[in-house]
Amino acid sequence: MNLLKKKSLWLGALLLLLLGGATVFVIYKELRGQDIIGTLKNANIWWVLAAVCAMALYAVADGINISRCLKLAGYKISFAQMMRYSFAGFFFSSITPSSTGGQPGQLYYMAKDKLKVSHSAFTLLCALLSFQCAAVFLGVFGAVCSHGEVFKLNGKFAYVFPIGFALNIAIIIGLLCVLFTRRIAGFFAEIGLRLKKIKGLKPGDKFRFLRSFAAYRKAAFLLKLNKSVFLKMLITSLAQIILYHSVTFFCARAIGCSGLDWFTVLRTQSSLFISVSSLPLPGAAGVTEYGYALFYADLIPTELLGSVMLLSRFCAFVLPLIGSGLGLVLLSIKPKCGKGQIS
């Protein structure tokens, strides 16, 4: 084994150790002081399995949307690759502050599969736009069905809810501009080129950068011509978010909240999610828990609310974090490279 291979092996082992440590730390922080074992023992296992299956389908739906956009750009990816990108998004979002590592992690695995950065970036932005549109639609739907109660909440964090709505709308507008407005996309490309100049351009760097921008614009043009692709992505995102919100319903039933119906949970979770999901706050998790207690105060008995919240967090975050991490390791053992058809 030569020196380069040994160095690569050691770096890989170190990275795996760091990621494993980060995963253990996040799980410890989530479950510290909580009796998750006792909660699971007292829960109906079939409803818990339903919650786990919902999150598994959530990951598959995410992978399907990524594969749709890549297929439009001329790539043929396997189911394993599709799931690897999905797992990377969830895993790195979960272990990084403010969920900033999701897209970079996905770009890394796409680059390993020889996908062009321009096509990968466009694909992830489209998937994000689809998800945001579906989340806002369901959030507005939930707020309307609850007669606008989300805007009438009182308390220390009441201000975050209307701000959350506004931020999500702003994100959608920004994504639309970056994806489909040539001038704004060109503006960001110019910024990127200037940053490269500061670091020092090598021969051919400018040409490669402009070529990547042209490929990005070509992918955007193809999506405009194939609007049905984005419509399918939007429908998939709606199903994906509904599955995610259904986890709370399954967990509530598992704990014994037999009087709580699925539609009530859907509209409540939709309003809560759209309110706090895009807030760039260090204590966003605390805000979510406060909102959870506030939204469900009249829906779930006080003595069961803590157990439902804990079980929901375990099924919607902790288990998927472990599963996505293991999935990444297993699916990266024998990676298969896709081939792009667009230059």
How would you describe each model-predicted region?
Residues 80-89, 126, 263-274, 304-314:
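Alpha-helical transmembrane segments of multi-pass membrane proteins
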Residues 63-87, 251-268:
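Membrane-embedded helical hairpins/re-entrant loop segments and their flanking transmembrane helices
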Residues 1-38, 92-201, 281, 285-343:
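Transmembrane helix-loop-helix hairpins in multi-pass inner-membrane proteins
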Residues 34-42, 110, 212-224:
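A short amphipathic helical element positioned immediately N-terminal to and/or at the very start
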